[in-house]
Amino acid sequence: FTLNIPGPIKVFPLGEMTFEEGIRLIDSQLHAWKIPVLEKRTIRDFTGNEQFWSVKGDTLFIKEILCLLEDSLSFDIDVIRTDETKVSRTELGFPGRKCLLCSNDAFVCSRSRTHTVKELLDKACELMKDYFEEKQAKKLSSLSMQALLYEVSATPKPGLVDRNNTGAHKDMDIFTFEASAVSLNHYFEKFALCGMEKEHENGHEPFSRIFARLRSLGIQAEDAMMTATKGINTHKGLIFSLAILNCSLGYMYANHIPYSPDTLLSINRKLVADVLEDFKDITAETARTNGERLYALYGMK
């Protein structure tokens, strides 16, 4: 196993991350299918990292399960028989590898030098970056959903919904909260990806623009929640809070900003810097929510 990295530079941080992820994914497949691993060996060199497995099993079956991995990233996974012949994708009915940049056969593009090395390397790096950003977004989404489920499951909570009763609420129970949490899982991921997006090539996008995109996603999330709960507001406040939190964490990840609570809070503030503009014309009479009314009467934020 190695990576298909175009150009002379084969080893760099993002490539190293992808190489280690490839090893993890292949190990996981071999373990899941109970394929005995007799020996493993890693070779690290400036010409490119390589990982070898000596396994016991049906080579055609092993190639089949690894072909699905091969198509997900810039993985180059060869399965070699004991007679030193290589199992090809076409033996299993899989099409040849496609070019990273177009739908043509990769071998044809390579032979005719259809694309420049820079174009191919940029695309390979983009695929690797997108993979890890999506993985991080899914992790943040999972943690957000866990938080919602743990919160409603905490028992007892006098006056609030918990596992044993509905507290002061007559229109919702723990199942309402669970349905709401499930409906929001996909949006928590989108909130994180929103912070990772870069509308400008140099990456310096105003936080106000990011927040505008985030707000649109938040409205969609509220609609999904209301559909799941049949019109009951279970998590509207948490949608707002977790949208900001996940977006900020996504922004930090994509921009390689080391995590600290103070840094996270600073980015949160920058994201919502203009949100008070929404309240400048609100009065106690025109307020639509308790929060707006408290702001109009007492300036509570």
Regions found by a protein language model. Give the residues of each.
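Short, well-structured hydrophobic secondary-structure segments
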Residues: 1-57, 173-199
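Anaerobic metallocofactor- and corrinoid-dependent redox/one-carbon enzyme cores
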Residues: 1-8, 28, 36-37, 44-47, ...
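Long, contiguous binding/interaction regions
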Residues: 1-33, 44, 66-74, 78-134
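Short, conserved charged micro-motifs
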Residues: 11-12, 59-65, 257-263
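A contiguous pocket-lining binding segment that forms or flanks enzyme active sites
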Residues: 51-68, 293-301
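Catalytic cofactor-binding cores of redox enzymes
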Residues: 75-79, 87-94, 226-253, 258-267, ...
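Long, hydrophobic/aromatic-enriched structural stretches that serve as scaffold segments
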Residues: 190-251
